[in-house]
Swiss-Prot record:
GO terms for molecular function: large ribosomal subunit rRNA binding. This is Large ribosomal subunit protein uL10. The keyword Cytoplasm does not apply. PANTHER family: 39S RIBOSOMAL PROTEIN L10, MITOCHONDRIAL (PTHR11560). It comes from Prochlorococcus marinus (strain MIT 9515). The keyword DNA damage does not apply. The lineage of its organism: Bacteria, Bacillati, Cyanobacteriota, Cyanophyceae, Synechococcales.
Amino acid sequence: MGRTIENKQKIVTELKSLLDDSEMAVVLDYKGLTIKEMSDLRSRLQTNKGICKVTKNSLMRKAIDGNSNWTDLESLLTGTNAFVLIKEDVGGAVKAIQSFQKETKKSETKGALFEGRLLSQSEIKEIASLPSREVLMAKIAGALNGVATKIAISINEVPSGLARSLKQHSEKSES
């Protein structure tokens, strides 16, 4: 039995909501994947704030219609597609997809859209090579902490330097 119009509208509304919350969309050809493999991919993506949706291209076309951030996705809407919508950890999610593809050897990345721009295969691989969100945050925190420490040392050095200068001056005056 086919889907009802109400059911299709509900799916389109859900897709629009997911797209609004997403930073990146990756389109995969899922032909040949088993249910178990799709479940494996979905669980890998959950830890990286990603979600994998399998839906008809026509419904995705309706969901992106009128949304300038996602209109370039239209060129990828052919064949059997799974849509990976990533909310936060883009690098981690792309790594999870590539790791999954390496293990199963059944799925191909058709393309991706990030910040309203289609990405090439090499750009997608570059994103996967980026450190995770947590690692980047730790590096930034370390850098900020280093700057704060240097400022504190410099601020403490001013009174100490002034005291040494005054002491030297007073010793010269006594001589």
